[in-house]
Amino acid sequence: MIRMSINTEVRPADAEGIARAAELLRQGELVALPTETVYGIAADARNGEAVSKIFVAKGRPQDNPLIVHVTGPEMLHGLVSEVPERAQLLMAAFCPGPLTIIMPRGPEVAAECCAGLDTVGIRMPSHPVARAVIEASGCAFAAPSANLSGKPSPTTAQHVYHDMAGKIEAIVDGGPCRVGVESTIVDVTGERPRLLRPGGITPGTAAGAAGRIGHRQSRGGRNLRGYGGSRAGHEIHPLYPLRRRDYRHRHRGAGGPLYSPALRA
């Protein structure tokens, strides 16, 4: 059952706050968590009812798939049906970090995460709070940005509270996000990698690890939907770096450095 009014807790990112967030996720509730990119609304990715609450809270179309967050490759069993070689190269180069890799979907991912697709987006966040909650809960979690659909992506707990108070169970306040833009999304399920969304890793940097990356393309005369890619508003050349000024206007307080492997620690 989805409640329409909730007394949203705001918890510090200490041991007690992490334990409370993990408990709520195991109970099928929604919790906003900091990542290195932006704050996300997390739900157990194997619990379809919990994942459905995300769409209600955000006012997000259900045909827009969600990204599943894990701590590392050891959690991929059941979430993906295979790990393509290019995915392995990208994970070795950039994970944990602000990269989402589209892979063939496994049987344990809730259908609600995937919007009818046979693929799933996988990300391994580097933020210590997000990782601690995954480990404490034992849950891979689906987590889009913790804002109302169409609003700027939140980079502080205060931003999340403004949009999500009364709609989710809890917010874990881990301070401002370091990267401040969403993860780069690369699809490795085709003949060559495709950029679905620019973000914290530049397309040229990703291409160096996985081979030349093509643009998001259309099928049947319409743009491919999902994972926030349609919001970029323009194409990014596969060999040219992402310029911060192209995206800063879409994010509250996005001022941190764009990601490089040296910043992962």
Task: Provide a role label for each language-model segment.
Residues 2-265:
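Active-site-adjacent structural elements in enzyme catalytic cores
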